[in-house]
């Protein structure tokens, strides 16, 4: 068996290079055909869309994009008062029917309730937007208790997987879509976000695998936004990283990009799009990205984590 690995180590590099040279033109052609296909935009008028974390941030503004196109909305979050405001705004923007379902995505029974109430009210489900999430603003060793990290994984990862589990039978019937809001930190490490980054990376790998399992019945779009001006960029977060240091994008612009990606059936939405090039550098020359992150941490961030 070791001999087989030795042979593969020797053969695969030249074979891979040859493959890329020979088939790259064909790849470009298929990408062009894919772009032409994406000129078609899905009509979401009358479609039923369930959005978690809809009380603020990306979830709120994605709801507004759907509302403008006449979609019917089921809005989920813990803050009922905020949901009511988002629901009313969505109605004014053009949504014909909006319900709110307060609850916690980290609770399995609540996740079942979200789906059950949506089906009871609308009779179907077309799109599931997994957006609910919480941030992290301390380095790993500065957690007061390690158990405090559990809630990040429970909400950011398990919250999306729980509700997806209950939604799949209904999405199969409607040939629907699942959208998951991950983060650029799933690919590029961010200081003081170790558990947060892990939760977002877990989302990417889970839904990439699920995409294989449930295709072609259900389509999956994975969004990887960078720094976005939402409630998650808390005053503590902005103070730590510095408002000038963070190249934050408006939440409305990000939501529009995600909505366009959903409508075009894109597998991934990376916003802002320049982050794609950082991902490329990370894949080709990971040491360069690691060096830059180390430099940024030592030069800008380390003073915030010094202990008494």
UniProtKB/Swiss-Prot annotation:
Q: Tell me one GO molecular function of this protein.
A: oxidoreductase activity
Enzyme Commission number(s) of this protein:
1.1.1.-
Cellular compartments annotated: Membrane
Enzyme class, broadest EC rank: oxidoreductase
Keywords, alphabetical: Lipid biosynthesis, Lipid metabolism, Membrane, NADP, Oxidoreductase, Signal-anchor, Steroid biosynthesis, Transmembrane, Transmembrane helix
Q: Which biological process annotations from GO are given for this protein?
A: steroid biosynthetic process
Q: Where's it mainly located?
A: membrane
Catalytic center residues = 196
Which cellular component terms (GO) are annotated to the entry?
membrane
Please tell me where NADP(+) binds in this chain: 53-79, 104, 196-200
Against InterPro entries, the record matches this protein to: NAD(P)-bd_dom_sf (IPR036291), SDR_fam (IPR002347)
Q: What's the protein's topology in the membrane? A: Single-pass type II membrane protein
- Top-level taxon in the UniProt lineage: Eukaryota
Transmembrane segments in this chain: where? 10-30
Positions annotated to bind substrate: 183
Q: Which PANTHER family match?
A: 11-BETA-HYDROXYSTEROID DEHYDROGENASE-LIKE 2-RELATED, RETINOL DEHYDROGENASE-RELATED
The text of the family note is: Belongs to the short-chain dehydrogenases/reductases (SDR) family.
Could you tell me which NCBIfam families the record lists for this protein? PRK06181.1
Protein known as: 11-beta-hydroxysteroid dehydrogenase-like 2
């Amino acid at each position: 068996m070791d001999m087989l690995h030795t042979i593969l180590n020797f053969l695969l590099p030249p074979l891979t290079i040859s493959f890329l040279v020979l088939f790259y033109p064909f790849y470009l052609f298929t990408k062009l055909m894919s772009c032409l296909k994406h000129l078609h935009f899905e009509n979401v008028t009358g479609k039923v869309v369930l959005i978690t974390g809809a009380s603020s941030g990306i979830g709120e503004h994605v709801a507004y994009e759907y509302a403008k196109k006449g979609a019917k909305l089921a809005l989920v979050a813990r803050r009922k008062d905020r949901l009511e405001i988002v629901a009313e705004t969505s109605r004014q923007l053009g949504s014909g029917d909006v319900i709110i379902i307060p609850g916690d995505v980290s609770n399995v029974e609540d996740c079942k309730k979200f789906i059950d109430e949506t089906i009871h009210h609308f009779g179907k489900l077309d799109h599931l937007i997994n957006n609910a999430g919480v941030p992290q603003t301390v380095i790993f060793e500065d957690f007061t208790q390690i158990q405090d990290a559990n809630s990040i994984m429970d909400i950011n990862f398990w919250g999306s997987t729980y509700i997806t589990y209950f939604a799949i039978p209904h999405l199969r019937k409607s040939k629907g879509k699942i959208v998951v809001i991950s983060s650029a930190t799933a690919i590029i490490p961010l200081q003081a976000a170790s558990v947060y980054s892990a939760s977002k990376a877990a989302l990417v790998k889970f839904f990439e695998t699920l995409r294989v399992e449930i295709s072609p019945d259900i389509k999956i779009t994975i969004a990887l936004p960078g720094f976005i001006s939402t409630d998650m960029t808390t005053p503590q977060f902005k103070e730590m990283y510095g408002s000038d240091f963070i190249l934050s994008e408006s939440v409305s612009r990000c939501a529009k990009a995600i909505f366009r990606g959903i409508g075009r059936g894109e597998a991934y939405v990376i916003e802002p799009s320049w982050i794609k090039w950082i991902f490329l550098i990370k894949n080709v020359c990971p040491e360069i990205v690691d060096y830059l992150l180390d430099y940024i941490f030592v030069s800008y961030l380390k003073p915030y984590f010094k202990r008494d």
